[in-house]
Every structure is written in C-alpha cells, then in structure tokens.
C-alpha cells in the first residue's frame, strides 16, 4: 500500500516548482532534501511525485503507447473461475519487463453487487481489485479499470434505460470513491462493449436507440465520477461506442460527455476480422494490400479524433493462433507502429488461453510459469511501438497436446463429470479444461464426452455447443449423429451440385462446391482436371491453407504434408465460379495413410441464388479499378459461405457473374438465371435432381445486373422474380425464401430494385405464402473498401453475412 507523505514545509518549498501533487514513498521517511525538481529522502532516494498533472489526454495516451489486458481474470465470476491463476505482482512485473507501459484490468461486478437500491459492492471484491491495481501502479505503469461483462443488466434500450442507469451510477459511485485519491496513472472506462445482446444490430453499430442510450449512460457515469471528489474531477475517463466498434454508424453518433477534454474514446479493433478473429478465415497477413488496408483504418480513426484533439485508446486488439506465427508477428509490429505513430495507444487482449489452432488463443504470457508463449509477438509489438524491453523474454517451450479420444459405448455427450446429467457443472468444468485450469475430467470417459461435435478436438467450439444445449437452443450434440472415423466405412462427403456419371470421378462447376473427408496419416494429395483457370482452398483441421490453381489441365497437387500422424479433417473448396469451367476430382492420395469414414452431412441447408456478388467476384482484390482475376475470387469468404458457417449449415451456391432475371450486365447476350438454375453442369447440359438437396432456406440476391447500366421493365422484372420464387417453391415446398437487395446498387437503380422486390414479397405474403421475406444488405460506401470492379470486399461480405445471419436466426430460430 502506498504511503502518502503530507509535509507542509516540503509542499511550501516545492509547490511553485511542481504544482499540486501527492508524494509516494516506499518506506517511512525520516528526512528530505531537494535536488532540482526532485524530492529525495534522507538516504538520497528519489520520492515519486504523483498527482493529477497538467497533461492533455493526447499527451497521456502518447505516454502509454502499448498496453496489455489482464483478461479472463477479474472479469470472470471469480478470479480463477475461467482457468487463470490468481494474479500476482510478479506476473505484472513480468509484463512490465517486456516494455508494456499499461495494464487494462477488466472487472465484472455483477456477481459481487448487492440488491437495490444501494447495489453495494462486496468489500472483499473491491479490495482485491484495488490490490491488483496497486500491483500495476507500483510497477510504474498505467492502469485502466472498467465495468466489463455486465451486459446482463446494462441494457441500452429506452425501456431499460432508467433501471440500468440507476445501478450503473451506484456502482460507479463506489468505484470512484474508493479510487478518488489515486493519481492520473489510473484511468476509468465507463463500460466495456455496451450493446443490446442478441439483437440483429448487436455487432453492427447498434440501432439509433442503442447508441442514444449508451451516450446517456456515458454522460451519467462521467458526471458521477467528476462529482465524487479527490482527483476524480481531473480523472481521465474512457467512453466506448456501441460494442466499442469502429464502424462509422457508431462513431458518428458518439457524444463526448460535456465535451470533456479528459474523456478518451475507447475502441476495440481486431482488424482485419478474418485474420484476427475468424478461425475459418485467412491465416496469412503481410501483403502490401493488407498493410495499406490496416493503415487506412487507423488513418480514419486519427483523422476523425486525434487530429481534432480527441484522444483514442484501442483497448482491445490481437490475433488468434492459426499456426501462423510469422503472419501474426508481421501484423503485430505493423499494427503497433501505425497506431502509436498516430498517437493511438493499443492494448493486446491476453485472455490467458493457449491452445494453438483454436478460436480463443490470444494468450501471450504463460501466467503459471511466467514465461512467454510467443516472445516473437511481444518483441514485434515493442519494435512497432518504439519501446525497448527491460529484459529478453523467456519462451514457453512446449505445446499442450489435445487428447485423442477412444470410442466407448454408451457415452452421454456433455456429461464430462460422469454423474449421468448434463448441467452447468459440466459446462464450467469444460471451460476450466479448455483454459488449462484442470488437466483431466473426473469421469474416465470425460475426454470423449467433452468432444460434443466429434471433431477429435476439445476447444471453444465444444463450449459454445454446450452452452447452446443448456439454453435449449439445440436439443442434441453433433457427436450424437456423427460417425466415428475408421477404416471400415471410408468415404467422401460432396457438398454442392455434383455429377457422378463419369466413373473416373465426380464433376462440379458452381462456386463453393467442395469435398469433405477424414483421413489418417501425415499428408494428402489430390488429382484435379479443370476446364479453365479454377482456384481451390484446402482447409485442414480448420486451418485454411494457401490457395492454388489448376488451369485448363490435369494436375496432382500436394495439399498438405508433415502433419502429426493421426486422424485429420480436410475440406477442398472450389473458390471460383462456374463460368471458369467444370472441375473433375480424379482421386485423393494419403501416402502411407488412409481414407476414413465420411463426415456426416449437416442438417441445416441453405441454397443461394445470385450473381457476381454471391460468387464473391474479386473480393480479395486490392482496388475497385482492378479488373477481374480468378485468383481474387474467393467464394469461401463470400457472404453466402460465411452465413452458412455462422449457422452451422451447408451452402449450395447457384451464381453466375453478370447474370440477371430479365437482362445481363450491360445488356450482354446469353442465358439468364432461369436458364442456368436447373443445371448441375451448365456447360455440359447435365440437369440437377432437386430431391438430392432440400434446403430449409433459399436466399435470392438478384437484380443488380437488371438495374446497373439500364433499368429493367417493371412488369418483366416482377414477373420473372415471381416465376423464380414459384420454381423454388415447387422444388422446396417448405423452404423459407429470403429476397435480398444490395450492396452494389445506388440511386434510382437501388430505389427501383428495392421497390419491385418488396412488391414481389408483399404479393407472396398476401397470397398466403408467409415464408417469403425481404432483406436489404448494407449498401457499400467505401468505408470497408472495395474488391475488383467495384465489387464488395471481404469486409463488406462479412457485414452482409451478419445482416443475413440475424434475419435467418430471427425467422427460423436457428
């Protein structure tokens, strides 16, 4: 605990030099002397002068530069509930040694708050928070504390505003009072990612109502802190946008409380999303385009805020481990350099979780051994921020292996403790296992029971499924339907429209057609015959590999080698569209390994009917002025594929660039969508048997080419659209049909297309077909970049997928 020395004579001597301050001494003081602007004790040791300095928020953030999050600790129900050890001062010292200058200490208060009207915080919990804060400050670092996972009661809607605000103010009154005499090395953050949980716009900037209420929450908290006395009238305070997002819609509506100069904007930016957060996204980062894109995003924040005198802290960023260390290192250095050079401090999200290849592996520090899992990333952050570490990092030498389960009869999936029931105890135990809080389960069959999706791995995917089961959003686990991979029933799952009439191998053409299989061994190769320049993506054990092409030839391609010997999962995905030619898979080879049983088809099925947008035309391109190149068409990262993955569904994509309902792009001759739709192989005239794939959902995204260069006749367009819906309804009588518009149209073309499609939907509803819906995608405005020829970027596809996912969930309850 700090000792505050109140010595009138010393203050009188120094007040004219240093202004108002507190003096912190590490030991009892027996005498003083002044040396220049320094206060020394009797032994000549400098006493640290700490007070609310005359420093701007911009300059303070420049001092911070680079920070670290003590994640999944005090923001858990209890400090060690999520598998991390109890925080020690040695842990914080280790962070300081590497050059980090600040620690964000997320705190969840919910389970430590008493009833209304006082909402008294448990004294022991508040004491523990203060103890950890002191660890940070004693190391000469900045600390940030907040109200973190309290979204269950901080609800930004008008209906809940008053109740939420009353509790929030009471909580902050107590926090602010406890810390009121701390100096400006302690910062407050009003809330963490405030949002309306479960709403369609939760992660899309929120609704106007959400943003308006969040502004009122921020104002109430800032006013409460300012009125609490001590140094809090000058305390630096962070305020977030809706969900702390950097989306324009959220930034535009953010109101700075009282235009207070000591208020700092709080943003979270795991950018780019598909590299940083999406386990199924790209594992590579480092191209000139990648760097320019990230720099552009930071420029936008700088120009909006910092350039105009408003400080910004990116309180959370980071990248998950996809066995791609070199890309993560390059990204970390570039991110830190570009942010810090613009006066923006950045804080790595370290949740303590380490399981390479899993979706939550953000940990840098091994908190148990006080060594570094990824010293290369830490060093890259410091190089980027221009910080010299105090010591060289000690790496953590080994990885934690994931156990391979042995099949046992009568397994109750989810019952990890073996008590014959599936409940919250099992869920907590599974989370602790994943976070390495425990090394084994009480039940001998716990390892098998924990793998509820039967992918031979125990990770956060299993935890999400467990939570869904307990919340009754699913009634059984995928493992209950899956086959155990073995050599007795080898096979391949074909997803998409395939023709099996040629004994040499199946053929396909449409975007997103893919083969999925399990194999045992260390390597895998495939032989492909392609009629044009087709590009493919292999995903092995959930990790996307670099794409490759087979261009109008037959080629054998080594997909992967050097794997640990054992069972592996492989998806081989056709990235390019049908117009680039048909593809034939002539066989797989696994070296000394073998093909295992085919994966079980997903129960949920979605069919997408569209044009170049659904094909993902040019979504990996670097410029809207760039012409189409097959390499940059990645249907795996299309809104269609992303939506399907979001919903644990398969996707059949029937899409063709430039195609329309009544006219093709620019009036080009050739078949329209109704001419293409019935075929498995559109060039060979092989028709599709619609009974082979009966989706619960059909998504139609057509009209862009009917309204781009000229405008379709209303009667013809409406009639053609209704004919397509009739064909879909004839093939799939019970399907939910989502009729979409966007995101490439604008002006009159957009207005007409929207009007006509809405009319079609309304006519269907009036005629008794209530399973036809209208969806408008966010229209692109350049804020998320462009692909080739003005087509949507991957970031735009993600926004489209978020919108469509929310709509489907809302209508079907998925």
Swiss-Prot record:
Cellulase, as annotated region: 35-354
Alphabetical UniProt keywords: Calcium, Carbohydrate metabolism, Cellulose degradation, Glycosidase, Hydrolase, Metal-binding, Multifunctional enzyme, Polysaccharide degradation, Secreted, Signal
Main location class: secreted
Catalytic activity: Endohydrolysis of (1->4)-beta-D-glucosidic linkages in cellulose, lichenin and cereal beta-D-glucans; Deacetylation of xylans and xylo-oligosaccharides
Enzyme class: hydrolase
Binding site for Ca(2+) 1: 415, 417, 419-421, 426
MF GO annotations: acetylxylan esterase activity; cellulase activity; cellulose binding; metal ion binding
Activity regulation description: Esterase activity of the CE2 module is inhibited when this domain binds to cellohexaose or beta-glucan.
GO cellular component, one term: extracellular region
EC number: 3.2.1.4, 3.1.1.-, 3.1.1.72
The protein's annotated pathway: Glycan metabolism; cellulose degradation; Glycan degradation; xylan degradation
Gene Ontology BP, a term: xylan catabolic process
Increases nucleophilicity of active site Ser (site feature) positions: 791
Protein name, per record: Cellulase/esterase CelE
Protein's organism: Acetivibrio thermocellus (strain ATCC 27405 / DSM 1237 / JCM 9322 / NBRC 103400 / NCIMB 10682 / NRRL B-4536 / VPI 7372) (Clostridium thermocellum)
